């Protein structure tokens, strides 16, 4: 999809409050990818992505911006934590595993797309097998079973939860060998033994999915899938490296820990600069993958990164701590607004939450104060507050009553939290519904 930077920011605004500078930076980076794709090959190969590094406290939207961006354009995306990697030669994950993870995501994306493309071709085969399974079920209790009616019921999804016995491919879990090589012994011996089938009992819904997968795999060219997946990862892949500040030592390495952190930085450097990483699907060039790094940078500074790595993240963005106004917007404005999430959950049990405006002010004020006075958790602070605020409502709701309105106003919030600055877990008001 060819979104303009303004359109990208507009889409991000639907889910993320504030952080205009970060949204603008990623929007421009994404649009530049599209611009690059329209250039002649000889020019295109000279233009590499401008990687981004974000600085800001936890919970202010760093990860969500990158994730929503990838979802918006259908790009393969992985989030990794810098602290999980160790220097080459030590036990732990090597940095190249982030590229292998990205390719795995890309393969799944391409395979899912191919599966949808061939679904109409394989569906008659799947339906035939399911009708036969349903026929065997029904003939036990019915003398005259109409296969055409079974097929229609199947297409109308009238028997989704009925249990049937079908013969499907037996897929044992692959054996994983941990270590720097991360060898998957299961995939290593793929194709050396004939596929095994076994009869399994499952619902029609799950049987359809299993049979669709099996029949699709028979006609999907996996060599073609792998080629497309590698190209997709190379040209559109996005890797989000979180907690990058945790692998940054102080200005001068003074301990073995600082030296080790610098070693991880130097291992990451060729990946970000552009190198070729071998995977089980083929070699992957990292030159045009977009890297987005992020960290709180409470102790270390961006300037403490090794200079070579600093140079590979030319776009630097500072994300702001959330204000009371931001918290109030998070409660009500986004498509996935916090109050809407809890309202949808409790409506299952016939509870209609009604949040008054003064209650939203109170909750937002509490979130801002607690983040300022204690640890800054960003938007995650709201979930802590909301869980405690609605604990009694959630506990007492059974769904065995007509739809009830529960009004949440300032007084209700203050009764639950007698001190705005601290959550007191053992001080809960007597629960009651306001109809």
Regions found by a protein language model. Name each.
Residues 1-435:
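Non-catalytic accessory segments flanking P-loop/AAA+ NTPase cores
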């Amino acid at each position: 999809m060819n979104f303009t930077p303004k359109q990208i920011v507009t889409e991000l605004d639907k889910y993320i409050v504030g952080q205009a500078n970060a949204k603008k930076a990623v929007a421009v980076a994404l649009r530049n990818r599209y611009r690059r794709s329209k250039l002649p090959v000889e020019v295109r190969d000279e233009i590499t992505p401008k990687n981004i590094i974000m600085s800001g406290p936890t919970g202010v939207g760093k990860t969500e911006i990158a994730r929503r961006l990838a979802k918006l354009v259908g790009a393969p995306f992985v989030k990794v934590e810098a602290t999980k990697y160790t220097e080459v030669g030590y036990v732990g994950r090597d940095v190249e595993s982030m590229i292998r993870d990205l390719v795995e995501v890309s393969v799944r994306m391409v395979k899912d797309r191919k599966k949808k493309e061939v679904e109409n071709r394989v569906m008659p085969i799947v339906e035939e097998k399911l009708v036969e399974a349903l026929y065997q079920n029904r003939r036990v209790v019915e003398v005259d079973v109409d296969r055409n009616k079974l097929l229609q019921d199947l297409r109308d999804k009238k028997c989704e939860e009925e249990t049937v016995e079908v013969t499907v491919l037996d897929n044992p879990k692959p054996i994983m060998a941990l270590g720097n090589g991360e060898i998957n012994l299961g995939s290593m011996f793929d194709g050396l033994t004939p596929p095994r089938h076994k009869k399994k009992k499952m619902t029609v819904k799950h049987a359809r999915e299993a049979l669709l997968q099996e029949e699709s795999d028979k006609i999907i060219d996996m060599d073609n899938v792998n080629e497309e997946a590698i190209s997709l990862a190379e040209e559109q892949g996005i890797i989000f490296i979180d907690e990058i500040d945790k692998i940054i030592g102080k200005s001068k390495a003074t301990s073995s820990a600082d030296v080790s952190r610098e070693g991880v930085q130097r291992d990451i450097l060729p990946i970000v600069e552009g190198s070729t990483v071998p995977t089980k699907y083929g070699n992957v060039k990292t030159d045009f993958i977009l890297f987005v790094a992020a960290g709180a940078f409470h102790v270390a500074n961006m300037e403490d990164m090794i200079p070579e790595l600093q140079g590979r993240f030319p776009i630097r963005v500072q994300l702001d701590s959330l204000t009371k106004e931001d918290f109030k917007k998070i409660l009500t404005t986004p498509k996935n607004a916090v109050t809407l999430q809890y309202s949808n959950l409790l409506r299952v049990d016939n509870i209609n939450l009604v949040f008054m405006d003064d209650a939203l002010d109170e909750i937002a004020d509490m979130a801002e104060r607690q983040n300022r006075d204690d640890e800054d958790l960003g938007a995650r602070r709201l979930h802590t507050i909301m869980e405690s605020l609605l604990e009694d409502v959630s506990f007492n709701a059974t769904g065995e009553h007509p739809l009830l309105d529960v009004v949440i106003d300032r007084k209700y919030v203050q009764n639950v939290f007698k001190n705005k600055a601290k959550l007191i877990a053992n001080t809960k008001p007597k629960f009651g519904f306001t109809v």
